[in-house]
């Protein structure tokens, strides 16, 4: 894909039957549905074409080639509405992830809001947050899951801890010295 390819719509998602879909550097894949085979991303995969909850499914492997994924998420707890990338095979390479806040006032997460799910191996995959996400008193950070969830990526909330200001140092007066 060198231009823009839009898959289906919210009422009628489309699954591309191709074995290999390549999103070139200037290309963009968006819409509703997925790719039956492998997806290589050097461009943009945009899931933000509707309200949060869009799922792009890759039936094969996903390879990030410094491409970008655009997602929308309601910033709340673990069960917040979000766009998701679901990879049935393996994931590898480096991909940047930009998340647009689509409502929500922030809340504590336990496991996090799952935004990327990989069924296969993801040892050689990097999904990197592009910018800060804040809601209320919370910052959201894109992190790889742990244990049995280590092939998935989550938006984890943490309290926005204010940076303490240095204490004022009292002036030193000679008459205080003994």
Where are the model-predicted features located?
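Extracellular beta-solenoid/beta-roll
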Residues: 1-90, 94, 100, 105-159
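Outer membrane beta-barrel translocator domains of Type V secretion systems
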Residues: 165-178
């Amino acid at each position: 894909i060198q231009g823009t390819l839009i898959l289906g719509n919210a009422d009628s998602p489309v699954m591309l039957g191709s074995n290999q879909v390549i999103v070139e550097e200037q290309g963009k894949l968006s819409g509703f549905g997925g790719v039956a085979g492998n997806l290589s991303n050097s461009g943009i995969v945009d899931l933000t074409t509707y309200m949060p909850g869009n799922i792009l499914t890759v039936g094969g492997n996903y390879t990030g080639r410094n491409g970008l994924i655009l997602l929308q998420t309601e910033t709340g707890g673990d069960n917040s509405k979000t766009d998701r990338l679901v990879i049935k095979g393996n994931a590898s390479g480096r991909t940047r992830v930009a998340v647009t806040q689509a409502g929500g006032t922030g809340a504590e997460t336990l496991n996090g809001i799952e935004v990327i799910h990989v069924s296969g191996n993801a040892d050689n995959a990097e999904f990197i947050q592009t910018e800060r996400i804040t809601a209320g008193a919370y910052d959201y950070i894109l992190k790889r899951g742990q244990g049995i969830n280590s092939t998935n990526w989550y938006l984890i909330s943490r309290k926005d801890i204010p940076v303490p200001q240095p204490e004022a140092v009292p002036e030193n007066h000679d008459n205080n010295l003994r």
